[in-house]
C-alpha cells in the first residue's frame, strides 16, 4: 500500500465496495482504464476504483445506477488505462487506484475545490476488516460469503421507488 491510494495485489483479485451506495460512474476512462465510481447515499462521499481487469473488469451486469452494499464484490484487479483505446493494459504494475472524495457542496464535485482523502490508514483498516468472498463455480465471478442487509440500502431503495 502507498499513501497515494494504490494497492498492489494480484490480477483478478476481487474488489470490494467500501460503503453502500449507488454506481455513479462505470466504464472506460483514458487515464483510469476500466473504473467504477460509487456515491454514498448521503452524497457526501465518492469512492473511485480504477485500473480494473482487462476484458472482465466488473461484477457481472453491474451498471450505472445500481445499488451496492458495503462488502459486495464490484470488480476485479487489473492494470488498464493510460490509453484512448478501450480495454488496453498500458500500466506495467497491476494495482488498484482507490480514492475517496469528500463533497460538502456541489462546488467540490469537480474543479479546484475537490477534497481527496489520503487513503493509507483507511486501506490498512479495511484490509484487516475485509469482507470474505468465494469464487462462483468455474465462472470468473466472486461473491461475498455472508449476506447482510444494510439499513441505508433499504432506506435508499424505498426513497427511489417513491419517486
Give the role of each language-model region.
Residues 2-10:
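N-terminal post-signal-peptidase region of extra-cytosolic proteins
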Residues 2-3, 39, 50, 78, ...:
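Residue-level detector of conserved, well-ordered beta-strand and adjacent loop positions
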Residues 10-12, 17-61, 85-94:
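Zn2+-dependent peptidoglycan hydrolase active-site motif and core
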Residues 21-23, 65-77:
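A structural signal for short beta-strand/turn segments enriched in small hydrophobics and glycine
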Residues 29-31, 73-82:
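Short, charged beta-turn/beta-strand-edge "cap" motif at the junction between a beta-strand
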Residues 43, 82, 103-105:
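Short coil/turn motifs at secondary-structure junctions
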Residues 49, 74, 97:
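Short alpha-helical segments in extracytoplasmic peptidoglycan/chitin-binding modules
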Residues 86-163:
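Acidic, glycine-rich catalytic/binding loops that coordinate metals and/or anionic ligands
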Amino acid at each position: 500500500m502507498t499513501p497515494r491510494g494504490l494497492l498492489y495485489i494480484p490480477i483478478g483479485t476481487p474488489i470490494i465496495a467500501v460503503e453502500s451506495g449507488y454506481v455513479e460512474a462505470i466504464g472506460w476512462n483514458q487515464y483510469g482504464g476500466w473504473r467504477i465510481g460509487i456515491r454514498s447515499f448521503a452524497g457526501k462521499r465518492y469512492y473511485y476504483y480504477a485500473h480494473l481487469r482487462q476484458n472482465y473488469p466488473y461484477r457481472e451486469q453491474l451498471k450505472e445506477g445500481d445499488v451496492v452494499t458495503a462488502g459486495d464484490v464490484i470488480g476485479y484487479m487489473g492494470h488498464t488505462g493510460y490509453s484512448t483505446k478501450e480495454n488496453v493494459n498500458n500500466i506495467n504494475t497491476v494495482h488498484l487506484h482507490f480514492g475517496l472524495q469528500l463533497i460538502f457542496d456541489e462546488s467540490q464535485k469537480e474543479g479546484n475545490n475537490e477534497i481527496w482523502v489520503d487513503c493509507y490508514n483507511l486501506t490498512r483498516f479495511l484490509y484487516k476488516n475485509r469482507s470474505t468472498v468465494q469464487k462462483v463455480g468455474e465462472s470468473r465471478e466472486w461473491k461475498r460469503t455472508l449476506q447482510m442487509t444494510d439499513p441505508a440500502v433499504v432506506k435508499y431503495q424505498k426513497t427511489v421507488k417513491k419517486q
